[in-house]
Regions:
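Active-site microenvironment for binding and transforming phosphate-containing groups
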Residues: 1-251
């Protein structure tokens, strides 16, 4: 479908469904899927129902009330949360893990780094929201550690998709943000104006590699939301209230 992005690395696994939604001017509110940003909820729900019916069918979505934390929640039952209304969303959480069939875990973003993960041996999926605060707290690495501790996942088995986000070409920050990432040589740059460019997607990738994920098991979309704001919501570029969804689930 033209209004979604999918990873090639997940395409060989027939027991999962995944997608990243895209901005679409033909849809209400340009296909925003966020209930929490103040837009008309009936139109957001219309978009959610449409994309759910056309792609996943009989699956239940679980979303979180994202707070730029490093909190991780394991979803242990099949029950929609945060999909039909925002009040039922998982509270104060930025990463979701499940092995329950029929559950789609997802994160909503408009520049932050969305990461989808899959353990094909143990049939476990996860969705991670990594802004600069979450990246500083190593939320992706902590999510994988939680899978190891809870389910005995082997990092070498884990397959990862890094969805569209603002990238090192465009993510300009002050020193108060950049100072947290100076250990990642080659993934930041000091500009002539005294600010820094920071490459959050590759910092998250480096964190996952440090725990033993194989590089060939990580697919980076290499799509910058700031550069491709016509296809993906970018808060930095347009100050939009729209958000796109990155989601994965076990059939």
């Amino acid at each position: 479908m033209e209004n979604i992005y999918q990873f090639k690395i997940f395409s060989n696994f027939k027991d999962i469904i995944h997608f990243v939604s895209k901005r679409d001017i033909s849809k209400p509110l340009e296909n925003s899927l966020a209930l929490h940003t103040g837009e008309k909820s009936s139109l957001i729900l219309e978009n959610r129902i449409d994309i759910s019916k056309s792609i996943v069918g009989d699956m239940d979505f679980v979303l979180a009330n994202q707070t730029h934390s490093s909190n991780i929640e394991i979803i242990r039952e099949r029950r929609a949360r945060g999909w039909r209304d925002k009040n039922s969303a998982v509270k104060n959480c930025d990463a979701l893990i499940t092995k329950v069939k029929g559950v789609m875990v997802g994160v909503l973003t408009a520049d932050c780094v969305p990461i989808l993960i899959f353990d094909p041996k143990l049939k476990i999926v996860g969705a991670i929201h990594a802004g600069w605060r979450g990246t500083k707290e190593k939320i992706a690495l902590k999510t994988l550690k939680r899978m190891v501790e809870e389910f005995n996942s082997n990092p070498k088995d884990i397959v990862v998709g890094v969805a569209p986000s603002i990238r090192g070409c465009c993510y300009e920050v002050d020193f108060n943000v950049a100072q947290h990432f100076l250990e990642y040589k080659g993934l930041y740059k000091l500009l002539d104006n005294g600010k820094y460019i920071v490459d959050l997607p590759n910092i998250n990738i480096r964190q996952l590699l440090s725990l033993g994920v194989e590089r060939e098991n990580i697919e980076d979309s290499n799509i910058c939301t700031y550069c491709e704001f016509n296809n993906y919501f970018s808060y930095r570029k347009t100050a939009c209230s729209g958000r796109f969804l990155s989601t994965i689930g076990i059939k």
